[in-house]
Amino acid sequence: MIRDALPGDWPAIWPIFAEIVRTGDTYAYPADTDKSTAEVLWMTKPDRTFVFEHDGKILGTYYLKTNHEGPGKHVCNCGYMVSSDARGMGIARQMCEHSQVIAVAMGFSAMQFNFIASSNDVALALWKKMGFDVVGTLPRAFNHPTLGLVDAFVMYKWLSD
């Protein structure tokens, strides 16, 4: 079940966030992001944050926020994280599908992913399957912990027609 995240969910979200950010191979957050900073980034700054819960356990989370104010406010941005023990179960796909429905309900017309590491093959394949296009390449913009500097992609999908 996907539902809005509650403040009391943070203790279950934090280990997912911390593990993903510490590996340093997908998100551009500092690997040493502390718990309170992470909570603001994931739970406070976004317009909404959601959790994927199964049998009372939080297995994934995503945020949805306005990508830019003013003339670009019709475009939203999302970030998704899935617990390492729950990967390969289709949770990211379900959260992405859910986020698109919520985005349209919130008045957004498009969704943009700002910084997808070119080395993140699993995410790239999924987002492409879900109709997102690579609309920009940032050469050597992501410093991968083992591969060094790799490109980052901007991905985009129009949601309304």
Regions from the language model: what does each represent?
Residues 1-13:
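A short beta-loop-alpha structural element at the N-terminal edge
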Residues 14-31:
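Helix-loop element at the rim of GNAT/NAT acetyltransferase active sites that forms part
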Residues 47, 150-154:
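Short hydrophobic/aromatic beta-strand or adjacent loop that forms the aromatic wall/cage
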Residues 112-116, 128-148:
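Conserved catalytic-core motifs of GNAT/GCN5-like acyltransferases
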Residues 7, 26, 30-85, 96-98, ...:
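Acetyl-CoA-dependent GNAT
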Residues 96, 120-123, 140-145:
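Short glycine/proline-centered loop/turn elements that form peptide/ligand docking sites
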